[in-house]
From Swiss-Prot:
The lineage of its organism: Archaea, Thermoproteota, Thermoprotei, Thermoproteales, Thermoproteaceae. Allows the formation of correctly charged Gln-tRNA(Gln) through the transamidation of misacylated Glu-tRNA(Gln) in organisms which lack glutaminyl-tRNA synthetase. The reaction takes place in the presence of glutamine and ATP through an activated gamma-phospho-Glu-tRNA(Gln). The GatDE system is specific for glutamate and does not act on aspartate. One of its GO terms (biological process) is glutaminyl-tRNAGln biosynthesis via transamidation. Residues 402-422 are annotated as: Disordered. This is Glutamyl-tRNA(Gln) amidotransferase subunit E. The gene is gatE. Its EC number is 6.3.5.-. Keywords: ATP-binding, Ligase, Nucleotide-binding, Protein biosynthesis.
């Protein structure tokens, strides 16, 4: 896919939890708990005008679902702020300093005065119905590892409550995560390839982590990706769980937009100007159906309704992403708006147990070339689903609708809700503006002293190649590497890094687990000259639980020969094969038991 020709633009929003002693707007500890919660309470959310006098479209979308929200909390780590029964406290100062420090890293301009804003979020993940956020800096630009990274904004915001599950129309949330400080870094739109965007996302995330002020572990970093192509629309893809998935998400979203534009072009050629809402009850057609799917609905007292989709023949089944068709997009909308599980459409019938005779009977009844079948018990749900389907069919005439979508594990995406509008954010009335003082900026400078390129320079100064240094920084082993270097001072850092990244990786491909304990034992044996570098792989491969590297070397006959013995061996072999061939011959005969440096030294001391 030629992304430049497509006019691909990608923006990133990187959210990283900060490792603070308190939450952002209260003094509760920022810890996640798995023990039984002490209490539960229930809330419902209702539509009201924002302080700007408007209603956000995403709010309408969520509230129409008529959900109940149940919140779980703990008396010793949850307070009235999280329950929206007490005004917020002033923002955590350490979080502010970190955000200002990260802003300095990216040469972003801090605001002189910070204003806490309310961003409407009505999926229940915020008890109040809004998320508090503070814009800290804007207009940053930095060149890091060859990438020109433009930063639109840097913000602090409170993390949402943890979703624990659903019980019918009730959504269960836990309040332990609500209020944990997040730093959000939003980039300018980029024209890089999907793989390069992944690199940029890693650079941004690592730049925050290297400060030592970010939480580590699963769920502490989340990426949102904004994708558009020429003629398409900005689509926000929420919650890409892993950096390695970013290229696929971008590729598949670009592909989806290309295919939606193809559908729009084809509809134009067919002369389809609009789709009117027109439904036909076809329940009686399926009175003797063999389809388990349909039969289950009918036995529950439900109905089957056909929604007319004139002009969409062969387009409902048109693939827009791998394994996902335009009909799948319609089903996503129906699932998001209603309690129905999905739909069937004419391009996939006969199928799902529905016979050719039943299909012909439906076609005769609806009188158009294509249609969508909806099945359900509640009449109101069927009416709502029919309206949603027709709205999406009409949106297809215009090409690509602006949406917020969720990332699937395979990189494809699904519809979540419409893109929010400007009425989503308004000022927090319970907190005063915060002055960005000279003292705060001075403390922020300390945060900004560390950098990704500075860390790579530090590693290369230890003797690591730039490639190995970059791989080490990208790996989860940097901290342990630094511990090993400090502990085993006589070992070259290059050797430690190579064993951790290359040898351990090769063994992992064989199914051999190389723990930190095993590595420490091997490094100790190397430092004490018990084994050679050449023996490391064999020793790690053979090491049993509780066994030391020295014990394994003895068992395998790979204990390093002392220099005096190496000298005698070298002298004998040199006489036998000649001085020039002696090094290779000794290493071949005594593989894993002699060190190459010892052999070279012995050769240099020969007097013939």
């Amino acid at each position: 896919m030629d992304y430049r020709a497509l006019g691909l633009k990608v923006g990133l929003e990187i959210h990283i939890q900060l490792n603070t002693r308190r939450k952002l707007f209260c003094h509760c500890p920022p810890v996640l708990r798995d023990d039984e919660p002490h209490f539960r309470l229930e809330r419902r959310l209702h539509i009201s005008l924002s302080e700007l006098g408007a209603v956000d479209p995403a709010v309408v979308w969520e509230v129409r679902k008529r959900r109940r929200y149940v919140y779980e909390g703990y008396r010793d780590t949850t307070c009235l702020v999280e329950l929206d029964e007490e005004p917020p406290h002033l923002p955590d100062e350490e979080a502010l300093v970190t955000a200002l420090g990260v802003a300095k890293m990216f040469n972003a301009k801090p605001f002189d005065e910070l204003h806490v804003m309310r961003k409407i979020v009505v999926d229940g993940s915020n008890v109040s119905g809004f998320q508090r956020t503070v814009l800290v800096a804007y207009g940053g630009r930095a060149k890091i590892l060859g990438y020109d990274i433009g930063v639109e904004t840097i913000a602090l915001e409170e993390d949402a409550a943890r979703k624990m599950g659903e019980e019918g129309k009730a959504v269960i949330y836990r309040l332990d995560r609500l209020g944990i400080p997040l730093i959000e870094i939003a980039t300018e739109p980029m024209s890089y390839s999907p793989q390069q965007v992944e690199e940029v996302a890693w650079i941004i995330g690592y730049s925050v982590k290297i400060t030592g002020r970010a939480k580590r572990g699963v769920g502490t970093v989340r990426q949102d990706v904004n994708v558009s192509i020429a003629g398409g629309a900005k689509t926000e893809i929420k919650g890409v769980p892993d950096l390695s998935l970013i290229p696929k998400v971008i590729e598949y979203e670009a592909q989806r937009q290309v295919n939606l534009l193809k559908i729009a072009e084809e509809l134009k050629k067919r002369g389809v100007a609009s789709v009117e809402l027109s439904t036909v009850d076809v329940t009686d057609v399926f009175s003797n159906t063999k389809s388990k799917l349909v039969k289950r609905v009918l036995e529950a007292g439900g109905r089957v309704v056909a929604v007319k989709a004139p002009g969409f023949r062969k387009l409902l089944g048109f693939e827009v992403q791998p394994g996902r068709r335009f009909g799948t997009e319609l089903a996503d909308y129906v699932r998001a708006w209603t309690e129905l599980g999905g739909l069937l459409h004419s391009d996939e019938l006969p199928g799902y147990g529905i016979s050719a005779d039943e299909v012909r009977a439906v076609e005769q009844r609806v009188g158009v070339d294509s249609y969508v079948l909806l099945m359900g018990v509640e009449a109101a749900e069927l009416e709502e689903a029919a309206r949603v389907v027709v709205d999406r069919l009409n949106a297809a005439l215009r090409g690509v609708p602006e949406e917020t979508r969720g990332a699937n594990p395979d990189g494809t995406t699904r519809f979540l809700r419409p893109r929010p509008g400007a009425a989503r954010m308004y000022p927090e009335t319970d907190l005063p503006p915060i002055k960005v003082t000279f003292e705060l900026l001075k403390r922020a400078e300390e945060v900004a002293k560390v950098s990704l390129e500075g860390k790579i320079a530090e590693l290369t100064s230890m003797g690591l190649s730039k490639d190995l240094a970059l791989r080490l920084v990208k790996s989860p082993h940097l901290e342990k590497f630094e511990e090993f270097v400090a502990r085993f001072k006589s070992l070259p850092p290059q050797l430690i890094a190579s064993i951790m990244l290359n040898t351990a990786k090769a063994l992992a491909r064989e199914g051999v687990e190389v723990s930190e304990e095993k590595l420490a034992s091997v490094f100790e044996a190397l430092e004490n000259k018990v084994i050679t570098k050449e023996a490391v792989e064999d020793v790690l491969r053979a090491m049993k639980p509780g066994e030391s590297a020295a014990e394994v070397a003895k068992r395998l006959g790979l204990v390093r020969l002392p220099f005096e013995e190496v000298r005698k061996i070298v002298e004998e072999v040199a006489k036998e094969v000649g001085r020039e061939k002696a090094l290779g011959e000794v290493m071949r005969r005594y593989r894993g038991r002699v060190d190459a440096e010892d052999v070279r030294r012995a050769l240099s001391e020969l007097h013939f």
